[in-house]
Amino acid sequence: MVCLAAFSAQAAETKKVDVLLVGGGIMSSTLGVWLHELEPDWSMMMVERLDGVAQESSNGWNNAGTGHSALAELNYTPEKSNGKIDISKAVEINEGFQVTRQFWTYQVKTGVLKNPRSFINSTPHMSFVWGEDNVRYLKKRYEALQASPLFRGMQFSDDYDQISKWVPLMMEGRDRSQKVAATWMPVGTDVNFGEITRQFVGYLQSQPQFTLSLSSEVRDIKRNDDGTWRVSYVNLKSGDRQDVDTKFLFIGAGGGALRLLQASGIPEARDFAAFPVGGSFLVTENPEVVNRHLAKAYGKASVGSPPMSVPHLDTRVIDGKRIILFGPFATFSTKFLKNGSYMDLFGSTTSHNVMPMLHVGVDEFPLVQYLAGQLMLSDEDRFNALKEYFPLAKKEDWRLWQAGQRVQIIQRDEAKGGILKLGTQIVKSKDGTIAGLLGASPGASTAAPIMLGVLETVFKDKLATPAWQQKVRQMIPTYGIKLNDNPAKVYEEWVATAEALQLSPPPRIDLRVTPAAPAAKPAAGAAQQAKPAKATADIAL
């Protein structure tokens, strides 16, 4: 736990702040806004190694832009050995995104975020499958999700003509005898996390207590005798070195977070290793194609392939322009960041984490096979994969785009030696003076609850005060409420956030129906605690 007070007179050679944020992406900016709302007098600094914020994973071109709420992503609803569909993870993810919607709604109402359609747009989410077994699974999934108010309004169809009305490009040219099925959820969203980041940081820059340092790379992290942290960084343009002392240090540096946590020397970082996986997409900007597809259509991984291989045909709105992406196709580089170093993987390997990495390499051999196969894909192979979703696609309309890097978490495990984890993980010191975020999807979509989880663990005493409680509930009206158990609250907040964010209105919810699905853990802390039955990699935010 950390109790912050303003520093006294600053030493000339060392800047002193209450909070230092390393990394200029969606996570650091979200935490910065949280803390400024709760403690507007605290001094705060953000350090970013590139010459602008939101240029790595948060950049709209470096991720799939899905507002992850488990409406279409089939890997969140596995079929158990007894044939039943487990929706607990889907409920957890959806509850987390509802917190995010509420957080953004508050920021729109207070003027921190402006013009909602610049960063979020209604885009139906759909699952699309073919083959008898997959059609059967999707029908069972749809029926299981009806137990939760979070998924009311979802439609299921195995009728060629009905699906054609939803996604004509995906059905034209398809054999009508092929068994297909789809679910359709109109309340899905496409999100430009880069735009949100830029607006958040722009707001923070307007506050006198906030400082932004760009083109600044952290080179050293040491603990001071008084328990604070001294962070040394170098301006990559001038070569000047600067030290800053901080009472609380947050490392939201994406793929660079692990090495910085290791540099701090905290023992909690020793249990983790990382494995980088990149992603590429086929892109079209042809208006004749783009204007006839409005959906994020997720498929199902092929037999024997890991969930990360799930392809999707996505409508995107990036910087005001509508496009379509198809992918992802896995790529490999030893870089942990798109703008990183080829030595990143080797530099993060230590005597503490090398064995967990080797164990994962053996236990997750299907993933290794999948990555090897992806690296062998030709342009023709990728185009043929697209045609499974868009039968009449034309090569000349599409180009290949290299998106961002995702660093998958490998954690030491006493039973297995090491496990590959899906999702995000907060790693913090015992005294709570330093914390960092590792992992990937659903990441950005649940930035608000993940950062609220940081506040719950690092600033536990502060969060218990009436002042913080009142402010948090002002921003998150359902804080502490399990939405899955409260259909009335789901509908109330759905309506409020849809109106503020200029999104499609939600479906009516039958308040007499009591959900039978297992409730998720409180959304605020759930994201970093997620434990899927069989975790594997995910290369899209």
From Swiss-Prot:
The keyword Ion transport does not apply. It is an enzyme of class 1 (oxidoreductase). Its cofactor is FAD. The keyword Lipoprotein does not apply. One of its GO terms (molecular function) is L-malate dehydrogenase (quinone) activity. Its EC number is 1.1.5.4. It holds the Pfam family Mqo. Keywords: FAD, Flavoprotein, Oxidoreductase, Plasmid, Tricarboxylic acid cycle. It catalyses: (S)-malate + a quinone = a quinol + oxaloacetate. Residues 520-541 are annotated as: Disordered. One of its GO terms (biological process) is tricarboxylic acid cycle. PANTHER family: L-2-HYDROXYGLUTARATE DEHYDROGENASE, MITOCHONDRIAL. This is Probable malate:quinone oxidoreductase. It comes from Ralstonia nicotianae (strain ATCC BAA-1114 / GMI1000) (Ralstonia solanacearum).
